[in-house]
């Protein structure tokens, strides 16, 4: 039986953009201009909207402008609020609200996360492995009460499983408070550590907590401290201080809990420091000293370290070193050779098996090998055109079973476990999707678009079966393409609302990610960054030419560095897109990278370039969306940000929108929404995030041209 709400949504969606423009508020907010010069040794630039930057987020004039933009957005969105509600009901209606994860066994307990009907936040709980009543460790719904934003960034149970250390964010800026809860009483200990990163590690005696202290201005982790329970936090020991501001920092326990591991990482190099978890000295030892263009990751088992490294291996290889030989990489022994056609992404260690997450021809798979003979491999892969297979949480190294997660654009996330010796496989849980979803109604496909330089770009597609490739379907195209982060073709229940309305959903695996190996990333960063943008445009052209999509119904979305992508294509090829959605976009590239007081800037010189060097300054300026705005027609655009975003500061998109309003020559809607309580990831509750997605989809659907059937 047809869903009446879905039909209603489709009818409302067919309002023409002309009708909506006629109903729009007559005037958009106009930000005043104020003289300001951004100085650089390579030239000065006028920035009349620089005043929109307020690091304290309190300036009345700035808040008034952001609120005016929010009001303008809301007035526009009110004209399709029925559609918006329909979409929100659909998206939320697919969620099994009282759901829980597959329990993970560690020590004497099985740990899991669950949600309750109608509740925004998770509940972290456990049960005795031998059987018994549930113990709620953290009810985030209770912790979040009365707060505009609340998020648990991390938690770690002590080795004796009696204490829980957890990191909470109450602003959205990823500046955490660290607390310790006594699981025997359910009460938090009195000491609270503030201004910390989310990463944590325990000492073997359950009495000390290792954590990262952040710089209050840049929000970079700079110091490793050790807190003794019951002691005043002002007396916490400083164990290590990082002087190089291009390095990120984190801390955790090795998988076997034998070591505390500090990782220091920049774009092109890293270093890992280790300390026995029962060592009171606090003196860390380096696995191998840092060196430019040399990276490695480590894990510990059976008195040795297994190392994944790019040393003479762009796609990584595995090596090993004994505990008493660390510090000198000439002592490393080969374990698994480099393969130029297979990228090693990560690995897990078991007593009898080595398990690797790897990527071949752009697709993820899992490889299992017995330590007794690493030439004997068993694979977890699929015959679906585009999919993801990766290891899941496996806390017990001595297990004979390992868990992995499988998903595709048509298959909801599924957790399996496999017996490593026999290959026996069993499904533990498949994400339940409500609302009448049937994966057999959908088709996934992998196609290859040709870039301007002849490179073949993989594209993952999702559409409803029966799609006529006649050039009439609307397209919703997504990509990220930075930091070597690969865009996985995983299941998204939200996008079904567009696919059910005839959309083709495309993930463009453009350069700057790492889908096709390390070279794929190298060819989409620094002085090759423009490849990211032209790849995306070339994918659009391919999908239109091959009649997957109508040229007047192409929509695109990206966030953060993907928001930079949206800003770049808006300048480079505005005529190819009917609408763009840019979430928390990084659009003022040069000004941000010149300012080392802004969080993340110094860490990312090897991603974007250091504008103090003229070659990088000129290149970044050539694509920076804010600097390259010009008098031309632009697509309809929805831009979002969070006032407390620490990754991409709110003033970047605010300035961009303010300038764009004065320079664009079209009458298409330009909407800007600031979440006044959120950070980089948007609102913290699960339903709040779904409602924001419904807002985005309603905006896109409202732009579709009228259909004779509407």
Predicted regions and their residues:
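Mature N-terminal segment immediately following signal peptide/propeptide cleavage
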Residues: 27-80, 88
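Non-catalytic accessory segments flanking enzyme active sites
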Residues: 61-156, 167, 247-300, 334, ...
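Hydrophobic beta-strand positions that form the internal "hydrophobic ladder"
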Residues: 110, 161-164, 209, 260, ...
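Beta-propeller blade signature
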Residues: 126-128, 179-182, 223-231, 274-277, ...
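Asp-box/WD-like beta-propeller blade repeats and closely related beta-sheet repeat scaffolds
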Residues: 134-154, 165-218, 222-225, 235, ...
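Cap/lid segment of the alpha/beta-hydrolase catalytic domain
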Residues: 141-158, 166-173, 184-189, 418-424, ...
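Blade-edge beta-strand/turn elements of extracellular beta-propeller
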Residues: 183-194, 231-243, 278-288, 326-337, ...
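Active-site-proximal cap/loop segments of hydrolase catalytic domains
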Residues: 507-710
């Amino acid at each position: 039986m047809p869903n009446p709400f879905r039909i209603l949504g489709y009818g409302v969606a067919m309002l023409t953009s002309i009708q909506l423009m006629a109903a729009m508020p007559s005037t958009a907010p106009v930000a005043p201009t104020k003289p300001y010069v951004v100085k650089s040794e390579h030239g000065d630039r006028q920035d009349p909207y620089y005043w929109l930057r307020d690091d304290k987020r309190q300036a009345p004039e700035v808040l008034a402008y952001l609120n005016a933009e929010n009001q303008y957005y809301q007035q526009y969105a009110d004209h399709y609020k029925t559609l918006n509600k329909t979409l929100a009901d659909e998206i939320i209606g697919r969620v099994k609200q009282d759901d829980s994860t597959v329990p993970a066994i560690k020590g004497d307990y099985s740990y899991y996360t669950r949600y309750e009907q109608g509740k925004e936040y998770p509940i972290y709980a456990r049960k005795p492995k031998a059987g018994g009543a549930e113990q709620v460790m953290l009810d985030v719904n209770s912790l979040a009460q009365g707060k505009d934003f609340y998020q648990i960034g991390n938690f770690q149970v002590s080795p004796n499983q009696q204490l829980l250390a957890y990191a909470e964010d109450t602003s959205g800026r990823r500046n955490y408070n660290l607390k310790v809860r006594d699981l025997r009483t359910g009460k938090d200990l009195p000491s609270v550590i503030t201004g910390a990163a989310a990463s944590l590690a325990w000492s073997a005696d359950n009495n000390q907590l290792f954590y990262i202290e952040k710089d209050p201005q840049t929000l970079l982790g700079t110091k490793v401290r050790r807190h003794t329970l019951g002691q005043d936090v002002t007396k916490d020991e400083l164990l290590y201080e990082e002087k190089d501001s291009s390095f990120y920092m984190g801390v955790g326990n090795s998988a076997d809990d034998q070591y505390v591991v500090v990782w220091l990482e920049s774009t092109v190099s890293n270093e890992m420091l280790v300390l026995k978890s029962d060592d009171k000295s606090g003196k860390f030892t380096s696995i191998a000293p840092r060196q430019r263009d040399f990276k490695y990751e480590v894990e510990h088992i059976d008195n040795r370290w297994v190392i994944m490294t790019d040393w003479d291996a762009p796609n990584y290889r595995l090596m090993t070193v004994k505990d008493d030989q660390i510090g000198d990489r000439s002592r490393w022994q080969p374990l698994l050779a480099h393969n130029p056609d297979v990228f090693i992404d990560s690995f897990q260690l078991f007593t009898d098996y080595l398990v690797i997450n790897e990527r071949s021809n752009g697709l993820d798979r899992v490889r299992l090998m017995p330590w007794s003979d690493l030439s004997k491999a068993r694979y977890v892969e699929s015959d679906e055109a585009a999919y993801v297979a990766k290891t899941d949480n496996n806390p017990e190294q001595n297990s004979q079973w390992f868990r992995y997660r499988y998903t595709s654009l048509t298959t909801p996330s599924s957790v399996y476990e496999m017996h490593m010796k026999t290959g026996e496989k069993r499904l533990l849980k498949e994400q339940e999707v409500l609302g009448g979803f049937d994966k057999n109604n959908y088709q996934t496909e992998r196609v290859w678009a040709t870039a301007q330089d002849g490179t073949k770009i993989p594209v993952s597609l999702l559409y409803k079966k029966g799609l006529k490739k006649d050039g009439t379907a609307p397209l919703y195209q997504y990509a990220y393409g930075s930091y070597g982060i690969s865009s996985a073709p995983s299941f998204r229940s939200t996008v079904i609302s567009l696919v059910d309305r005839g959309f083709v959903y495309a993930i463009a695996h453009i350069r700057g990610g790492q889908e096709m190996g390390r070279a794929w990333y190298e060819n989409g960063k620094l002085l090759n960054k423009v490849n990211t943008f032209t790849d995306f445009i070339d994918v659009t052209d391919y999908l239109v030419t091959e009649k997957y999509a109508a040229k007047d119904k192409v929509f695109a979305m990206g966030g953060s560095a993907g928001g930079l992508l949206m800003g770049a294509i808006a300048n480079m090829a505005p005529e190819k897109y009917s609408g763009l959605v840019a979430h928390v976009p990084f659009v003022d590239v040069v000004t941000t990278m010149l300012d080392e007081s802004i969080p993340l800037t110094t860490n990312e010189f090897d991603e974007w370039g250091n504008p103090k060097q003229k070659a990088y300054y000129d290149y970044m300026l050539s694509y920076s969306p804010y600097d390259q705005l010009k008098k031309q027609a632009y697509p309809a655009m929805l831009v979002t940000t969070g006032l407390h975003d620490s990754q991409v500061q709110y003033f970047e998109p605010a300035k961009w929108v303010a300038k764009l309003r004065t320079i664009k020559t079209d009458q298409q809607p330009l909407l800007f929404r600031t979440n006044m309580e959120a950070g980089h990831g948007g609102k913290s509750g699960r339903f709040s995030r779904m409602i924001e997605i419904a807002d985005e989809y309603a905006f896109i659907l409202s732009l579709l041209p009228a259909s004779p059937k509407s």
